[in-house]
Amino acid sequence: MSRYRGPRLRVTRRLGELPGLTRKASKKSNPPGQHGQARRKRSEYAIRLEEKQKLRFNYGVSEKQLVRYVKKARAQEGSTGTNLLRLLENRLDNVCFRLGFGGTIPGSRQLVNHGHVTVNGKVLDIAGYQCKSGDVIGIKENKASKKLVEGNIEFPGLANVPPHLDLDKPKLTGKINGKCDREWVALEINELLVVEYYSRKV
C-alpha cells in the first residue's frame, strides 16, 4: 500500500485529529461517505486497524515502511510500542515538522526531498533518515530555502518544540539532544493496539 495522496480532511473526519497530516479542521462532523457511516459496535480488529491507520497517515509512511518499523522496534530493548513511536518521531521529515521548519509532515518531507535541509552541515534529501542524538538539522544556505522555512517557523504546526530538540530560531537550526519520551508525542494514539494489530501479521 503506497503513501496516501488524497483529500486529507476526509482522513481526519474518519480517524480524528492528525497534527502531522494537516492543520485544517473539517466543518463536517459525520464520517466520510454518502450518508456517513452507520453507528455500530466496532470489532477489536477494527479498533486496532484504526489505530494503525492513524500512525500511517499522521507520519505519512506506507504499509511496507510501517511493517519495517514494527520489526525494528521489536528487535530493540524496551517497549515495542514506545520504540515504534520513537522510530517514527526520529524520521528527518518529522523532526523538521517538530522544529517548525514545515507546517505539516508532508510539507516538511517536501523540504527534505527538494534539498532544502541539511544534517550536520550536509544536504540530505532522505525523508526517512533516522536522526540521532547530536545531529544538527539546518536549512541550506540560500535565499530560497531560508525564505520557505522562515514563513513556516513563525506559524508552526505545533505550538511547542519537544524537550529532546533544541531550536535556534535565528539560525534556523535544531539539535537532537536525546531520546523522544512517550509523552512528547503529539499524536493521540494507543500504540499497544498497533503492536497487537501486527502481532500475527509480522
Curated annotation (Swiss-Prot):
Q: Which domain of life is it from?
A: Bacteria
Listed Gene3D superfamilies? Ribosomal Protein S4 Delta 41, Chain A, domain 1 (1.10.1050.10), RNA-binding S4 domain (3.10.290.10)
Q: Map out region (Disordered) in residue numbers.
A: 1-42
Matches recorded under Pfam families: Ribosomal_S4, S4
In the record, what terms sit under GO molecular function? rRNA binding; structural constituent of ribosome
Q: Where is the composition biased (Basic residues)?
A: 1-13
For this record, the Gene Ontology CC terms, alphabetical, are: small ribosomal subunit
BP-aspect Gene Ontology terms: ribosomal small subunit biogenesis; translation
The record's SUPFAM superfamilies line, in alphabetical order, gives: Alpha-L RNA-binding motif
Q: Which InterPro entries match?
A: Ribosomal_uS4 (IPR022801), Ribosomal_uS4_bac-type (IPR005709), Ribosomal_uS4_CS (IPR018079), Ribosomal_uS4_N (IPR001912), S4_RNA-bd (IPR002942), S4_RNA-bd_sf (IPR036986)
HAMAP family membership: Ribosomal_uS4_B
- Function as written in the Swiss-Prot or TrEMBL entry: One of the primary rRNA binding proteins, it binds directly to 16S rRNA where it nucleates assembly of the body of the 30S subunit. With S5 and S12 plays an important role in translational accuracy.
Family note: Belongs to the universal ribosomal protein uS4 family.
**Record-given protein name:** Small ribosomal subunit protein uS4
Source organism: Prochlorococcus marinus (strain MIT 9301)
Q: What is the lineage of its organism?
A: Bacteria, Bacillati, Cyanobacteriota, Cyanophyceae, Synechococcales
Gene name per UniProt:
rpsD
